[in-house]
């Protein structure tokens, strides 16, 4: 976080909590946090002017059930969870909802040349979509694709989301590359994906917001046709891009 933020704990949950009055003054009523699951910060890390720049975007998840340790201001073991809970409580006290950006389309283990520290070791064939010759389908653009509609993986995702709702009191989720959550084990799009249906009708998740980034890196684009059961909202990427180009004046769209 840039020093101009003026916060005591930049780049942390506590640092964001310091800016809540500013958000309140803007009239903000909901905050969407980029991925806060524990993720691989060293992927794509680089040295620039002798400064080590880490990957802080969060889109290389390592553990779906744990908040990222580096977002703790104290850097003490197990403090990150308490600090995130404190942030969410303060946002709620100021009448702001909290949406988590969640990444269930892939993990930081990458393809067959990537590291092995979780699902590859548990059961590679269950947790990942594999081609007939044992390579990884890459509908995520990140090396592997989580096999979301296998019963084991589906239950893990449901348990994870319930955990974040019950334990952290989050108000909703934005699903990165959500179209992957509707593919079967060989990547074929399903008409009624078991995972998406289960999410739509789950008793614990019934009152939380479900927001789909309704496309993936495999070319599947489902804006306007995402399986929703009247429960899912959708990001409209093309509208977003058109509005950005218009506001910037690209291609003379503002003339």
At which residue positions do the language-model features occur?
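Substrate-binding/active-site clefts of carbohydrate-active enzymes
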Residues: 1-170, 174-201, 220
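Conserved alpha/beta catalytic core and glycan-binding cleft of carbohydrate-active enzymes
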Residues: 169, 182-186, 190-255
